[in-house]
Amino acid sequence: MVDRSDNAAESFDDAVEERVINEEYKIWKKNTPFLYDLVMTHALEWPSLTAQWLPDVTKQDGKDYSVHRLILGTHTSDEQNHLLIASVQLPSEDAQFDGSHYDNEKGEFGGFGSVCGKIEIEIKINHEGEVNRARYMPQNACVIATKTPSSDVLVFDYTKHPSKPEPSGECQPDLRLRGHQKEGYGLSWNPNLNGYLLSASDDHTICLWDINATPKEHRVIDAKNIFTGHTAVVEDVAWHLLHESLFGSVADDQKLMIWDTRNNNTSKPSHTVDAHTAEVNCLSFNPYSEFILATGSADKTVALWDLRNLKLKLHSFESHKDEIFQVQWSPHNETILASSGTDRRLHVWDLSKIGEEQSTEDAEDGPPELLFIHGGHTAKISDFSWNPNEPWIICSVSEDNIMQVWQMAENVYNDEEPEIPASELETNTA
């Protein structure tokens, strides 16, 4: 028998939480002109679990914007799923976000973010089930690998598919990669070895494929190696950015493992670290400093590591209120890192500020290394991506279909005082 009082209490809690989330969002929206140089919000037809900027950018003469592209996916309710390529028009320096266009009726600001900012889905490719994650191959950005709800990893060359999907819904990947027994999320292309792809799975393993190998019938390629060191769900995997044979993996066994493909032992990593006090969901190698990496965990912290001494955690970033599912270093700044997750927030951190003195008032907002909190999402953030061409621009996607493309105000990262007096900034006193 169901206890009705429990159900009533639960729905009351949900209603209260929803009210708090909505209040926080209204306050965030009012403050956007002071906190951001750009905010574009786009409601997708279906939520995307994945987001990655493609490396190319098109600038057109006489236009005050450039066109960038994004890889997205769908997570539908029993309808046909698709791998998506979207185009995004980003304003040039001289097309400034104008905070003066406040629309009292709508309670929001006009300016670039809502007027000229165009986001369009350009290519739709039929996909088997939702797209858990999609990542392009660095050596040829037309080649995209995807994680499916089955054990297969699919590879698509989007130039070989029509931009409108076949109405039959048939999914025709250019390659089908076999080796896993279950689905997963982690996916990483080797930036130094063309066609080498790693995948992490709920089956506790990591598979490595060489997509240049000769496929069997039905375009199937079997895993070249299967790494079996973890004892629980492997959440994420990442190649080192400089050393072609090194990669890292993290799992629900709370461990970070560093592997070297030159070692023939696929069950024993080179290094194993008890990284967190709960599941480890994500990792990212620093693009500028070859020894530095970060991991994010269900213990609500991001940890900083040095490959030369993994026994010692360099730092723990603490400010998130729930599980962390994604962590990514900025492609433009060695000391800048972002993390996101279940608490609906994306935090941007600056390592160079660790240990700086703070006033008591500032300390209440978070540690000195917490540079910025993006509060524009009202549901769990599934994925985010730093734009490789425009510094400080991030695309983030959440479970409620919302995609945001945004850039924090320049005075935040340049350490200048904002032009607006603090008394005019609305704060959340709830």
Curated annotation (Swiss-Prot):
Tell me a GO biological process for this protein.
nucleosome organization
Subcellular location per UniProt equals:
Nucleus
**GO CC, alphabetical:** CAF-1 complex; ESC/E(Z) complex; histone methyltransferase complex; Myb complex; nucleus; NuRD complex; NURF complex; polytene chromosome
Q: Does the keyword Repeat apply?
A: yes
GO terms for molecular function, please? Answer: histone binding; histone deacetylase binding; protein homodimerization activity; transcription cis-regulatory region binding
Q: According to its UniProt record, where is this protein mainly located?
A: nucleus
* PROSITE patterns documented for this protein: WD_REPEATS_1, WD_REPEATS_2, WD_REPEATS_REGION
Which positions bear Phosphoserine? Answer: S11, S100
Which Gene3D superfamilies does the UniProt entry name for this protein? YVTN repeat-like/Quinoprotein amine dehydrogenase
What does the record note on quaternary structure? Probably binds directly to helix 1 of the histone fold of histone H4, a region that is not accessible when H4 is in chromatin. Self associates. Associates with chromatin. Component of the CAF-1 complex, composed of Caf1-55, Caf1-105 and Caf1-180; within the CAF-1 complex, Caf1-180 interacts directly with both Caf1-55 and Caf1-105. Component of the NuRD complex, composed of at least Caf1-55, Mi-2, MTA1-like and HDAC1/Rpd3. Within the NuRD complex, Caf1-55 may interact directly with Mi-2, MTA1-like and HDAC1/Rpd3.
* Main function: Core histone-binding subunit that may target chromatin assembly factors, chromatin remodeling factors and histone deacetylases to their histone substrates in a manner that is regulated by nucleosomal DNA. Component of several complexes which regulate chromatin metabolism.
Name-wise, this protein is Chromatin assembly factor 1 p55 subunit
Organism annotation: Drosophila melanogaster (Fruit fly)
What lineage does the source organism belong to?
Eukaryota, Metazoa, Ecdysozoa, Arthropoda, Hexapoda
